[in-house]
Regions:
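Structural motif
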Residues: 34, 60, 88, 154, ...
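Conserved, mostly hydrophobic/aromatic
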Residues: 15, 39, 70, 93, ...
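Metabolite-binding pocket within alpha/beta catalytic cores that recognizes anionic/polar moieties
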Residues: 38-92, 99
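Conserved anion-binding
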Residues: 7-13, 73, 77-167, 172-179, ...
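C-terminal helical cap(s) of enzyme catalytic domains, especially alpha/beta-barrels
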Residues: 103-108, 205, 218-236
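Catalytic cores of alpha/beta
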Residues: 28, 76-85, 169, 190-210, ...
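N-terminal glycine-rich anion-binding loop in soluble enzyme alpha/beta folds
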Residues: 2-31, 35
Length: 236
């Protein structure tokens, strides 16, 4: 099955390599072939050779890499960590969207091609979850919008948010030329898993999202390549 979709569409799909180790991740990437050009490596994979996998996918296979670390620490530590990670030529890197964290990350990424994405509120959380964590009262969409605005003002190249909040974020003046990247995307009919604020690939694109992140619906599929191609078809 040949991928006849344009590269501009293929790059909108980021597949999360949430598999046990780098070898499994590489095998999956080889199975997906030209159907996927962008991969997310999260904290779980980092302990299983994730940075080595990132380097191999970049250098040997020409793929783009989204390193999902959600860094959160004092400014000096974040800046140093980001500066060290830029040696891997990462395309996207996540930090928590707090202004001091974003600002430090941007300083650490200076002179590199790494784009810093600020996390607003995890797509696996709803208002009840926020209440348990003693997060301030208010509609969750309003909180996401507030955090997105603060992240943009601190210099973030983009934000992580659910596709449900994407239209409001896109309408922010600060969002001009910034990226909106959304987990919480599930193909029509797919199980939600641990996601709560979700949309289909087609809905996400219609809502102004730049990139969608999909994991289990691809790598748990009997035919991962066909699953990825079906998602691209939904997005087209």
């Amino acid at each position: 099955m040949t991928n006849n979709h344009p590269a501009t569409l293929t790059e909108k799909l980021i597949v999360a390599l949430d598999v046990p180790n780098a070898l499994d991740g590489l095998k999956l990437a080889e199975t997906l072939g030209d159907a996927v050009s962008f991969y997310k490596i999260g904290l779980g994979m980092l302990t299983g050779g994730g940075l080595a996998l990132a380097a191999e996918l970049k250098d040997e296979h020409g793929k783009k890499i989204f390193l999902d670390m959600k860094l959160f620490d004092i400014g000096a530590t974040v800046e140093a960590a980001v500066r060290g990670l830029t040696q891997f030529d990462i395309d996207f890197l996540t930090v928590h969207g707090d202004p001091h964290v974003v600002n430090a990350a941007k300083q650490g990424a200076a002179g590199s091609n790494t784009k810093i994405l600020g996390v607003t509120i995890l797509t696996s959380l709803d208002r009840q979850d926020l209440d348990k964590c003693l997060i301030k009262d208010g509609d969750i969409q309003d909180l996401v919008l507030e955090r997105a605005g603060l992240a943009f003002e601190a210099g973030a190249d983009g934000v992580i948010a659910s596709p449900q909040e994407a239209p409001m974020i896109r309408a922010l003046p600060q969002a001009k030329d910034r990226l909106i990247v959304t987990p919480g995307v599930r193909p029509a009919g797919a199980a939600l898993g641990d996601q709560k604020r979700v949309a289909t690939p087609a809905q996400a694109v219609a809502n102004g999202v730049d990139h969608i992140v999909v994991g289990r619906p691809v790598w748990q599929a009997a035919d991962p390549r066909a699953a990825a191609m079906a998602i691209l078809d939904e997005m087209a």
